[in-house]
Structures are given as C-alpha cells and as structure tokens.
Amino acid sequence: MRSEFWQNILDRAGKSEDGKQLPFFSLAPMEAVTDVVFRHVVSSAAEPEVFYTEFTNASSFASPKGIHSTRGRLTFTPDESEKLIAQIWGSRQADIEFMSQELPKLGFQAIDLNFGCPDKAVVKSGGGSGMIRTPALAEEIITAAKTSGLPVSVKTRLGYSRPEEFHEWLKFLLGQDVEVLTVHLRTKKEMSKVPAHFELIDEIVKMRDEVAPNTLLQINGDIKNHQQGMELWRAHSGVDGIMIGRGIFEDPFCFEKFDIEHSRQDYMNLLNQHLDLFDKHNTEASPRKFEPLKRFFKIYVRNFKGASDLRARLMLTKNTSEVRQILTEFGENYEDMMENYARISEEYHKNKNSEEV
C-alpha cells in the first residue's frame, strides 16, 4: 500500500491528456547545495514535486557533539513539509534507528537512505556506495529506518565497479519493500566520468515490475532539464520519477515544463532572492558561513556579456552587503557597458575587414 506522502507526490505530478500518470520530478540531494535557502530559490524559479535535504550522517546526529552541527542541514520551513524528504546515511544500525525515530518529531514525513555517495571517506566508513558491498548491512539499515513509521526510500548506483552488478544489487533492494528506489545510472567507480547508462533503464524497469511492482522507480544521471526528463519518460515506459542533479548548476530554471528564454534580470532577481534568504536564515542560533555562498554565483551570473568580470568581482566579496553593492553598480552601469561592447565590436570588425581587403 502506497503511503499518503508519496501518493500526494504522484497526485501533484498529475496525469497526461490520455490519463497516464506523469512522472514526478525532484532535485537531487547535494552536499552544501540543497539547503533551505537554495530549495526556496529553486521553488521560485520552477518547482519540482520533490526536494531532499543535504545528506546527513546519522552517527553525527546521534552524537552530543555533532547534533548541533547537523541540525542546520535539516532546517526547513512549514511550506516545504509536504514535498521534503530527509536524506540520511551511515553504517551504524543503532544510529540510523535513533535518527529515523527523531525525524518525525522534527516534522519530516519521509526518509531516504543514501546508498550511492562515492566519496572516499563516506565509503571507507561503510556508508554511501560502500553499502553495495555489504547487502546484509544494507538490509539492517533499511530495517532500522523503517522503525520511524515513515515511508523509506533508497538512492543508490548501478553497482560498485561494473554496471552489470545492478542485476543482483537492485534486485536485492527491490526485495526490501522500499517505497521508492532512485538509481543513479552509473557505478561508484565511474563517478560522473562516463555517460549515464540510459541503455539499462528498460531492464531495470522490467526487474522492478517482476520483483516489486509497487515500488516507484526514479532515475538520475545526466538529466539536465524537464524537457529531457520527459523525453526519457516517454522512451522508457514504467519510469515513475526523474531526478535532476548537476543540471541545476547549468540552469536554475531547469524544472520549467517548457523551454523559456530568460533575461539577465531574471537571473539577477534569483541571485538577490538567494542573498535575502541567506540573510534571513543566518541567525545566532544557526549561523551561516559566507564563503560557501560564492559557489552559487556561477549559477546566476552567466550567459550574458560582462558575466565573467562580474563573477570575478563577486568572488572577492566578504559579505552579502558587498555583493548587493556590486550588483547595484553593475545594473546601473550595464547600458553604458553594452554600448562600449558594441563600439569595441564594431571597431574590431571594421579593422578586420580592412585587413582582409
């Protein structure tokens, strides 16, 4: 029986004109990226049906010393509760059980277990894609998470070293009665260095249909936007969800259902919103470091003349006030700058043509 949380997700995804269930879209959980601030920025640009928190270590959460450092990762606002999933990881059954049972008290309605992170430190500790090599432990971790009473899902990879490992590994996971199985279509060894194995989607769908027809299947890897996701869904019947990860860095509007051209000001508005939200959530109780904010500048400051110079200036800032000042100056001088670009370009082409003659 499907949980109310996931049924609501499917209902929000809607039906096609012929009555077929449309896929739900989600933003992949990403370290130091998918926090409460960025999730709200993405929502305002084009909202997917599902969000995930940054992945949070259960052992740190269970530790008296680490509990405060992990709480910030789990911060969310009331309007997110119907679409936000807490993604957790770890290799200690007791810690997973403790954290899973605490999550409902924090207001979470669903849990996702990270069995796919390829980070060396995570894998060495037995977590992330290290679980692929220890299925017995993976089963214990899933069982521990289920003690929360919340719907439990798993995000993983095809295998550890070889794509063919999916035959055993994914079949094993499908036998664990998880609500959703998200498959990053690469192995741990492949990282993101090779193209995602879209050619295996149909085999995975068939396996799901045979082993666990009630488990929702979500695919991830090399999917840049909503349009590409829909193309994959149409080409591979049986896929229930589409997860976009790095595509968000190329286009913050990637969840838009139609290809819309956005102006420079549209991107600047998102950046200003990000700054406002950063300041709003930067409190004494939950202080935020400014330096990590700089990694987001390239998402918004791109694909227009002067973007490279503007980014270079922004990277030298020390606080949001300095960023706002530079953005204001840039906006006020933009028209003059464009005239200079046009003049320089015209002179360049004149000189080039005269040389050719």
Where are these regions (language model features)?
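Hydrophobic faces of well-ordered beta-strands that scaffold small-molecule active sites
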Residues: 25-28, 51-53, 84-88, 111-113, ...
